[in-house]
Regions:
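Hydrophobic N-terminal alpha-helices or hydrophobic patches in metabolic proteins across all domains
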Residues: 1-253
Length: 253
């Protein structure tokens, strides 16, 4: 049964103010101060993470281990709540991405990995995800993006259904970028769907052909404000609830 996962999830929600990324950011800063080559740093991280995974493989599954795993990997960040206090437009755009990232990386992907591969790989993903917040660690970021592909599609299915019922429209304009986003920046497609649901524009920076440019997605019918952000946040929590129920059902089968 999934009682251990339920307890771990509840503790994670109760301790939502615990900023895991601040801990990993401290580790990353100290490591880069000692070792100047970021590729060497990433190699050492991957080696240590592999050792951790081997150690976790020897732990027998039980409800205590399940509870600890759920507490570690489920991380609905408090960052978006903090950003609600800031009314600058830039912060609202950041907040949409933060909510999407928390939904995928802090919830759906870890649970997906538990179902498919067990607790150990979910913990490994969480470590990689938090370390990859440092954009210099591009290899770790690439691994995290690959792991997010299928979970992103799962979230997009929920978001698309909500979009269709709310807007009475089947068409989403990804401007020909859906496939490239899916394999390079899978979370961007989630952000785009969120923009269409809330009827706002979402801007993304792109690099290509020696050019840096800004691309706009969504519909400019509303401005991004507290109401929009709170609505998307509630949608995100609803998806988390449905995914967790499905996860528990799978555990019972």
């Amino acid at each position: 049964m999934g009682i251990g996962y339920i307890i771990g999830c509840l503790f994670s929600i109760l301790l939502w103010r615990l900023d895991r990324q601040r801990i990993f950011n401290f580790i990353s800063v100290k490591s880069k101060d000692k070792i100047k080559n970021v590729y060497v740093v990433q190699f050492l991280y991957l080696f240590l993470i592999f050792v951790i995974y081997l150690g976790l493989a020897f732990i027998k599954n039980n409800q205590v281990y399940n509870a600890i795993t759920a507490f570690i990997v489920i991380d609905i960040s408090n960052t978006e709540r903090e950003n609600l206090k800031n009314n600058e437009k830039k912060h609202f755009y950041d907040t949409i991405s933060t909510i999407s990232r928390a939904l995928i990386c802090g919830f759906i992907t870890p649970l997906f990995l538990i179902v498919m591969f067990g607790n150990g790989l979910a913990i490994v993903f969480t470590i990689l995800y938090n370390l990859s917040a440092d954009e210099d660690l591009n290899i770790l970021g690439f691994i995290v993006s690959i792991a997010n592909i299928i979970p992103s599609i799962m979230a997009e299915v929920f978001l698309y259904i909500i979009y269709v019922f709310r807007n009475r429209n089947l068409k989403i304009k990804f401007k020909g970028d859906y496939i490239s986003n899916l394999f390079i920046v899978p979370l961007l497609n989630v952000d785009i769907l969120a923009a269409f649901i809330e009827s706002v524009n979402f801007y993304s920076y792109h690099n290509g052909n020696n050019m840096h440019y800004l691309k706009s997605y969504g519909d400019y019918n509303n401005k991004i404000d507290n109401v929009c952000i709170k609505d998307y946040l509630s949608i995100s929590y609803s998806i988390c609830f449905l995914v967790f129920i499905a996860f528990l059902v799978i555990q019972l089968i």
